[in-house]
């Protein structure tokens, strides 16, 4: 099963006036049903998901939090790319990445696995997960999701 690495801020939660992002519940259902999901967030860089679940419990109902317990932790220190198995088949969903992280992806021929979320488009999160499920990475994705 393809891996899906997830950030929280800017993906599942909005970055301003924090709340659940538009489409987040549908996104979570689709992601958990179709991918092996991993947290790739500053809230869980030590391999412990407790802080993530506690944070998300402020914005999502208990049944969603129970489902989110299936998302696996990652460990990384400086760059999020340290927490990604770059040899695996994966997507990385985030709203912002550092240039150094893009360079790691480029060096490993994985830049196309990065998908940036645009919270200014209320349908963006659900549209992107549906596209990932239906199309995979068989070519260029139909949106400007990173800078090459």
Region spans (language model):
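Alpha-helical substrate-recognition element adjacent to the catalytic core
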Residues: 2-78, 147-148
């Amino acid at each position: 099963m393809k891996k899906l690495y997830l950030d929280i801020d800017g993906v599942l939660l909005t970055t301003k006036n924090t709340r659940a992002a538009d489409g987040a519940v549908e996104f979570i259902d689709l992601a958990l049903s179709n991918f092996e999901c991993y947290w790739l967030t500053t809230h869980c860089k030590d391999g412990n998901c407790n802080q993530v679940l506690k944070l998300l419990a402020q914005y999502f109902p208990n049944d969603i939090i129970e489902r989110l317990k299936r998302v696996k932790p990652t460990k990384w220190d400086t760059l999020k790319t340290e927490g990604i198995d770059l040899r695996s088949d994966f997507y990385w969903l985030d709203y912002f990445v550092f240039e150094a992280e893009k360079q790691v992806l480029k060096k490993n021929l994985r830049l196309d696995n990065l998908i940036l979320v645009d919270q200014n488009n209320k349908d963006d999160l659900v549209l992107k997960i549906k596209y990932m499920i239906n199309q995979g990475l068989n070519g260029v994705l139909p949106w400007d999701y990173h800078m090459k």
